[in-house]
A protein has these predicted regions:
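Membrane-interface "cap" regions at the ends of multi-pass membrane proteins
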Residues: 1-64, 172-175
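Membrane-embedded translocation segments of transport machinery
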Residues: 333-365, 386-405
């Protein structure tokens, strides 16, 4: 595997981004006086910040790698995880669940279930969410760091893991949900700039949308469905029935309406209108994500074979397999997850590589901070405080809840 060699300009861009997140977290600390400020941003979040935060917190760095790889192998249907798998469910959540949750004044979804049913339901649901969030946090950190740092850059991922964990942990510890959302706004901009840069250069290199479609069509029947949104029901990876009903109707609605990490932002909205509008804005912004993460994978079908044919040394021979197509024998990557790293190495100039890596780190750090904030809110509200009351103790006051929330985040 050949590694991406970052220029000093790239390191400067990444460093400025990291320092910026640190400064924002430090700045928001002065607005945190009680538990409501820490856990729900004082219920003062505007709709645009909520929308930005929902999108970037739901997109991980592995989405850029995984979805592009699936698009390379299966086609544009891989984009349905953000189209049919998010947008309709977010509209549904905005008008049905979000107003109801916001008016109830709860801090968490488990707290709402506790009011609706009983303390047992609240504790069980909270316990499940804590375990899921902590496991996903560890997996997110290690998997992404290993994929991006060891595989792409060739560095020891532990340094990156600790750097991102400390910076993200600091601003989440200091500013709570306010810091999470405000850094998310910056992170979404960084992520979009990096992702759209890769998309623009990818389309430029293959001659535009028309040339891309013609080039893929010329490769023959095995690539005939690469521009089909819904694949046949007998497709092994993305059958239309599974995408429409399993993903779009069942999983997406449950995820967008019942996931604390998603709904958390809307609970901190300054008005019910902001809560609904934030979710709707998030759905609109999410419609652009597949353009950044799936289309570069499609472009790679044309770009990489041409580059490898011109100079076989640009990609190690062990990464390449030769496939017979209607357009002739084409050198293709054996592993679909190597598509984006290879495109970044071969296509992006210094500066844009730094922006792209900053965008990938932004996607990861937003997911981490959102998970930390939501997990600490659930732990203090639904597990510690609820158990304390059930055992005959007094509920936590505002200062105690704030201290326990920060303590759990640090832990």
């Amino acid at each position: 595997m050949q590694f991406v060699h970052l220029h000093w300009i790239d390191f400067t861009i990444i460093a400025v981004y990291m320092v910026g997140c640190f400064v924002i977290g430090l700045y928001t600390t002065k607005y945190i006086d009680n538990a409501g400020d820490f856990f729900l941003a004082g219920k003062a979040l505007p709709f645009w910040a909520i929308g930005f935060s929902i999108v970037v917190s739901d997109i991980g760095a592995t989405d850029f790698v995984g979805v592009a790889g699936n698009a390379y192998t299966y086609g544009i249907s891989a984009a349905n995880f953000d189209w049919l798998g998010s947008m309709p469910a977010m509209v549904f959540a905005a008008f049905i669940f979000v107003p109801y949750f916001w008016r109830s004044g709860v801090f968490t979804i488990p707290e709402f279930l506790g009011r609706r049913y009983n303390a047992g339901v609240q504790l069980i649901n909270a316990g499940i969410w804590i375990m899921v969030m902590l496991i996903s946090l560890v997996m997110m950190l290690w998997t992404t760091a290993d994929d991006l740092v060891r595989t792409v850059l060739g560095y020891d991922p532990m340094v990156t893991v600790w750097a991102m964990a400390l910076i993200t942990g600091f601003y989440t510890f200091s500013g709570g949900l306010s810091a999470v959302v405000m850094t998310d706004v910056v992170q979404l901009v960084v992520m979009y700039v990096g992702g759209l840069s890769l998309l623009a250069l990818s389309l430029w290199e293959v001659g535009g949308w028309g040339s891309l479609r013609e080039g893929v069509a010329a490769m023959g029947d095995q690539f005939a469905n690469h521009f089909t949104i819904l694949l046949p029901n007998d497709h092994s990876a993305f059958p239309w029935s599974g995408i429409v009903f399993g993903l779009g109707v069942v999983m997406a609605v449950a995820y967008m309406s019942g996931n604390q990490a998603i709904v958390h932002r809307t609970l901190g909205a300054r008005t019910e209108w902001d809560a609904k509008a934030g979710m709707l804005l998030g759905g609109f912004l999410k419609s652009f994500i597949p353009l950044m993460v799936a289309l570069p994978g499609l472009c790679a079908l044309i770009y990489l074979p041409n580059v490898i044919k011109a100079d076989p040394s640009v990609v190690p021979a062990e990464m390449v397999e030769h496939i017979e197509t209607a357009a002739g024998v084409m050198p293709m990557l054996k592993e679909q997850d190597k598509v984006v790293p290879t495109m970044m190495r071969l296509m992006l100039p210094p500066g844009l590589q730094g922006l792209m890596f900053a965008g990938l780190f932004a996607a990861l750090m937003s997911s981490i901070s959102g998970t930390l904030s939501s997990a600490s809110t659930i732990f203090v509200t639904d597990i510690f405080n609820r158990s304390k009351v059930l055992l005959g103790g007094k509920p936590l006051n505002e200062r105690q809840a704030l201290n326990w929330g920060r303590g759990f985040t640090a832990f």
